[in-house]
Each structure stands twice: as structure tokens, then as C-alpha cells.
């Protein structure tokens, strides 16, 4: 669900969208860049509030590592839950330009919410080189930002080989969680959360080995959400210290499954090698993200 918190009349190249970004290595079975390139069907469910109903540009895009190629189409979103399907033949650049084969951005589905006049263009009816400006909409696009009562709900996005949308594939909560944790792991909640045991690097900084629940897509970046200006509590014996410590992450193994967290200004008066234990404060968070 998304809703505007203020109104906006877009000008120039202002634009906004919801986008699902996907790894290129997961789309090699499409055989793009060859004469065997495959047709795909994208499907999803959507509905709007009464004021949010209108035509929305849906753009599907692939990347070859240096440029992107796209198709797009207008869809009328209404106040009733509806399943939409978008079948895209393997024409245009699909037979001549492949999808990057790595964990980098290779495929993206975009639901455009608004765009200024500079980003309004004619429809791409087949896979086409998508030159600047990248975020194009089709004439007739709804301005989702014209009313703070606008609401848009989207769920059940599915991408399949072929010209038919099959029933949405439901997977177990455990498997879905593992897939999500490839991109983001959150430590913290309403109560304190144990983060791990660490050793003092010097009098104020510490090294913490972090064992992630699954291998991540890439070396992640840390973000902290504070409570009363702090996020971390570090104990050396019974001596605890609460702080807004700095944190950086580096790989210990090539699978991005174990990390070294170097945490600065975590305590004081430490001796190198001293053992410590760390937890995230209640209502604070450490977010470890490897999003594309």
C-alpha cells in the first residue's frame, strides 16, 4: 500500500514509481540476446481508492550491464481487486541484446505513479533501447500525487516464461523469509536483541563477528535506527555502555554469510582483546542491507 502524504503537480522530469529490482542471473533462462529469446508474462493484483483510480504506466525493463531496454503499457487500476496480465513477446532487442549474468540489477518492473511533462513519451510496444530520460510514462498517466486520499495496493507480482499467467505460486513463510534475507536482515524490535560477542580492538572500538542467517547478495551496508539518540549497548563484564556507535561491515567469506563489524566509540577504557557482548536497544534497529 502506498498513499501520498502531500500533493504535488510534477514539472519537468519529476517522477515517482514503485519498482521491483531483480538480479540478472535469475533471468538467463529467457535466452535474451539469442534467436531463442522467450516471451514472458508479468501478472499482479492491484486496486485503488476512489480518488486513486486511473491509468498507470507499467514498465518492464532489462539491463545488459551498461544500458537498459524496456517495454511499457497503460493499465486502468480501479477500486476492485483485479488481476492484471502483461504478455511481452520476445521481439525487438530481446533477440540481439542479452541480460547481464550476475548478481547486479538485470530486470525491473516499475509501477509509475506520476511524471512531469518531460518524461511523457509514446509507448514502447516491443523491447526497445531506453535512452535518457529512463523513467518514461505514457500519455494519460494518472498523477497519483494529486490527492492525499489516493491509495494504491499492489500484490502478487509474478514473472513467467510463456504467454499465459498461471495461478500465483504461494511458498512457505520460511522459504519467503530466506529469500528476503538475501537482501535485508533487521536486528532489533520492541525488546532488546542480542547481536553477538565481540573483542576490544583498542580502548574504545570493538570487532564483532556477525553470522548472517543466509548468504547475502553482496557485502551489505549498515543503517541504524535510534532510540533516544542511541542504538547499541555493549557490556564488558558488568560494565555497560549505551551509545550511537559507528559501524562498518566487511566480508569474512566470499558468500557474504559472515561479516566483520568494526564498531567505533562503543565503550571506553577497554584493553585490546577483552571480551564483550553486544545487543541492540529496545525500539532501536540495526539494518543490514544488500539491496540492488
Where are these regions (language model features)?
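Extracellular and organelle-lumenal recognition/adhesion modules and their flexible linkers in secreted
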Residues: 1-292
Amino acid at each position: 500500500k502506498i498513499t501520498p502524504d502531500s500533493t504535488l503537480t510534477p514539472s519537468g522530469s519529476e517522477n515517482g514509481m514503485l519498482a521491483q529490482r531483480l538480479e540478472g542471473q535469475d533471468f538467463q533462462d529467457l535466452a535474451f540476446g539469442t534467436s531463442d529469446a522467450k516471451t514472458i508474462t508479468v501478472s499482479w493484483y492491484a486496486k485503488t481508492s476512489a480518488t486513486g483510480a486511473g491509468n498507470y504506466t507499467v514498465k518492464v525493463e532489462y539491463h545488459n550491464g551498461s544500458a537498459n531496454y524496456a517495454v511499457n503499457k497503460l493499465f486502468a487500476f480501479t477500486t476492485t481487486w483485479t488481476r492484471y496480465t502483461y504478455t511481452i513477446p520476445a521481439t525487438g532487442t530481446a533477440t540481439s541484446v542479452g541480460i547481464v549474468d550476475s548478481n547486479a540489477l538485470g530486470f525491473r518492473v516499475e509501477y509509475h505513479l506520476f511524471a512531469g511533462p518531460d518524461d511523457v513519451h509514446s509507448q514502447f510496444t516491443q523491447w526497445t533501447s531506453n535512452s535518457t530520460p529512463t523513467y518514461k510514462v505514457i500519455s494519460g498517466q494518472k498523477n497519483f500525487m494529486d490527492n492525499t486520499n489516493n491509495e494504491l495496493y499492489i500484490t502478487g507480482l509474478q514473472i513467467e516464461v510463456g504467454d499465459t499467467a498461471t495461478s500465483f505460486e504461494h511458498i512457505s513463510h520460511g522459504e519467503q523469509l530466506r529469500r528476503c534475507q538475501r537482501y535485508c536482515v533487521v536486528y532489533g524490535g520492541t525488546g532488546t536483541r542480542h547481536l553477538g560477542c565481540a573483542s576490544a580492538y583498542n580502548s574504545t572500538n570493538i570487532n564483532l563477528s556477525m553470522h548472517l542467517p543466509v548468504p547475502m547478495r553482496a557485502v551489505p551496508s549498515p543503517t541504524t535506527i535510534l532510540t533516544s539518540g542511541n542504538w547499541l549497548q555493549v557490556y564488558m563484564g558488568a560494565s555497560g555502555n549505551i551509545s550511537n556507535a559507528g559501524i562498518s561491515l566487511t566480508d569474512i567469506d566470499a558468500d557474504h554469510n559472515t561479516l566483520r563489524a568494526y564498531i567505533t566509540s562503543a565503550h571506553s577504557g577497554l584493553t585490546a582483546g577483552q571480551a564483550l557482548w553486544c545487543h541492540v536497544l529496545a525500539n532501536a534497529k540495526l539494518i543490514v542491507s544488500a539491496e540492488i
